[in-house]
């Protein structure tokens, strides 16, 4: 790995209870199985390490600022390997926006603020944050997330050139061509 141009490091979760399933909530955002240590050791050998993340939910990434790229692939299915290879070789533009917020720490998430919200009270979970769930909580509380809802690469590049308006003076409701 030290002499390689880059290292592709595949990390993530699995569909096991307590990791990434509908059976049980995660008690931690940390990647299991010492994956953070694997990133640290790999970066020590080759700092040009690209992380390919396979997970269905946000995870902690204490190394996020140390890697040149993170490719969030979620669970891409049977042809995921082909799709990831096409992205990495430049055959396809890696584009998309995050559908969730990645908190910096578990404590930043309102769902983990009390025993009423996690793990719940006698099989009942109380959403004390009311409408301020997900990205709304981070915005309202002015908490900077690791990656915000909507973070990601553009779907395309575009530019406007040689624009001209049909008039120099317009008011609200006017049609311009």
Predicted regions and their residues:
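Secreted, periplasmic, or luminal enzymes acting at the cell surface/secretory milieu
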Residues: 54-177
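Hydrophobic helix-and-loop "lid/oligomerization" segment in the mid-to-C-terminal part
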Residues: 1-66
């Amino acid at each position: 790995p030290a002499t390689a141009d880059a290292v592709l490091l595949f990390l993530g979760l699995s569909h096991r209870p307590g990791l990434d399933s509908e059976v049980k909530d995660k008690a931690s955002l940390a990647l299991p199985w010492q994956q953070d240590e694997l990133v640290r050791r790999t970066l020590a050998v080759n700092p040009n390490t690209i992380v390919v993340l396979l997970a269905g939910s946000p995870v902690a990434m204490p190394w996020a600022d140390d890697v040149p790229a993170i490719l969030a692939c979620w669970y891409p299915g049977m042809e995921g390997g082909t799709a990831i290879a096409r992205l990495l070789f430049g055959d396809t533009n890696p584009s998309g926006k995050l559908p969730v917020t990645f908190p910096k720490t578990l404590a930043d998430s309102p769902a983990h603020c009390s025993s009423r919200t996690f793990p719940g009270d006698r099989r009942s979970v109380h959403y004390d944050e009311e409408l301020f769930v997900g990205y709304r909580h981070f915005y309202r509380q002015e908490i900077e997330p690791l990656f915000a809802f909507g973070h990601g690469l553009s779907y395309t590049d575009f530019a406007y050139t040689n624009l001209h308006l049909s008039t120099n003076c317009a008011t609200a409701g006017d049609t311009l061509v």
